[in-house]
């Protein structure tokens, strides 16, 4: 069958709209008609080949849609179900069976291999050549796509499907890092470096956790203003003032918890300095391979500081995404305030607006 896709064809270049052939749905796959998909920073860095996957490639890993068909081995969803698409995992390795599928031993191959394990791709161009697929198990920048079952999360039909896609990655990453990993106590302090969609999701989670001091750090005043609206008690423009000194002034002895969503080496070092005794920091921002960060090992040791490296919020999507949706329905997790919708034909504008900071979470609607 045919599918319309936004295809990455050259390093750093805008995506191209192409009609592709979608192959048959395999036994462990679900064919999904996309309703919408988020645009994430990870899509941009793979488009730019910072993390190289063979081109041409259909990106997209925050899809939301309706199940059109299922493979013979699929048991978790049925035709007609509403679904959010998240990251893939094998389901049988030690990480998966212990409840940490984001650390699946096959994560790299399943999420960023560009093909199935047998080397086939789900998409073919008009000349019959292969187009890399299964990005994060889904490749959701297409009107219809084949998705690994373990990337599929069934959700209620009572919520607006158009905005649910970002729960599959960016929103899950920020909220999960706070709720699943940092687990701040009520009354504690937390500082969040970066006020993009991931950082704002962490901020919303900190509000849910009843943190009483929530500090947002960024270099864009408009994002800091939005952070204030969403629950930040303090904001710091680190371009204009010493963030670490200000954080220590606000908290007294350093923050109890910190989240770095930037992937910037210097910001990561700042995060370690901003934590107080027995503080716990988490890094979720993706950095280019080989990135190194200077930090004071002695300070970490003497202060008992703990640093966690967190992928996908250390979440089990099939349970965590419904939890976030339940919080959203109760008015406790208003992630919809981060979203701006774009038509499919505007996907490159969505990328540009995200990279400029004009839009927190672009969602492309089909």
Each language-model region and where it sits:
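Mid-domain Rossmann-like dinucleotide-binding core that forms the NAD(H)/NADP(H) cofactor-binding site
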Residues: 79, 143-144, 150-152, 156-241, ...
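N-terminal Rossmann-like NAD(P) cofactor-binding module of classical short-chain dehydrogenase/reductase
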Residues: 84, 256-259
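Glycine-rich phosphate-binding loop and adjacent beta-alpha segment
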Residues: 264-332, 366
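Glycine-rich beta-strand-centered segment in the early N-terminal region that forms part
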Residues: 23-37, 50-97, 102, 154-158
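C-terminal hydrophobic helical "lid"/dimerization subdomain
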Residues: 1, 241, 269-273, 277, ...
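Cysteine-cluster motifs in flexible loop/terminal segments that predominantly coordinate metals
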Residues: 87-150
């Amino acid at each position: 069958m045919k599918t319309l896709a936004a295809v990455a064809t050259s390093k750093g270049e805008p995506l191209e709209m192409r009609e592709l052939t979608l192959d048959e749905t395999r036994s462990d796959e679900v064919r999904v008609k996309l309703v919408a998909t988020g645009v994430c920073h990870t899509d941009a860095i793979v488009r730019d080949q910072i993390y190289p996957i063979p081109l041409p490639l259909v990106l997209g890993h925050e899809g939301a849609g309706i199940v059109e068909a299922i493979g013979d081995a699929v048991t978790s969803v049925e035709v007609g179900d509403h679904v959010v698409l998240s990251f893939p995992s094998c389901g049988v390795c030690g990480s998966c069976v212990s409840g940490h599928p984001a650390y699946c031993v096959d994560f790299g191959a399943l999420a960023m291999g560009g093909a199935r394990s047998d080397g086939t791709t789900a998409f073919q161009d008009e000349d019959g050549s292969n187009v890399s697929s299964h990005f994060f198990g889904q490749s959701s920048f297409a009107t219809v796509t084949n998705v690994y079952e373990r990337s599929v999360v069934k959700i209620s039909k009572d919520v607006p499907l158009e905005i649910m896609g970002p729960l599959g990655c960016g929103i899950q990453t920020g909220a999960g890092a706070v709720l699943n990993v940092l687990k701040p106590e009520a009354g504690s302090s937390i500082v969040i470096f970066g006020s993009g969609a991931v950082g704002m999701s962490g901020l919303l989670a900190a509000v849910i956790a009843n943190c009483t001091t929530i500090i947002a750090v960024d270099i864009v005043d408009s994002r800091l203003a939005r952070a204030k609206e969403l629950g930040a008690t303090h904001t710091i423009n680190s371009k204009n003032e010493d963030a670490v000194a200000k954080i220590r002034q606000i908290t007294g002895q350093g923050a109890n918890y910190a989240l770095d969503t930037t992937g910037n080496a210097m910001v990561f070092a700042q995060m370690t300095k901003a934590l107080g005794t027995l503080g716990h920091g988490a890094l979720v921002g993706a950095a280019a391979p080989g990135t190194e960060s200077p930090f004071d090992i002695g300070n970490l040791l003497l202060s008992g500081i703990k640093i966690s490296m967190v992928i996908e919020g250390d979440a089990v999507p099939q349970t965590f995404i419904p939890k976030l949706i339940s919080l959203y329905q109760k008015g406790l997790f208003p992630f919809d305030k981060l979203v701006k919708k774009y038509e499919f034909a505007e996907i490159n504008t969505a990328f540009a607006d995200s990279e400029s900071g004009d839009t927190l979470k672009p969602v492309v609607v089909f």
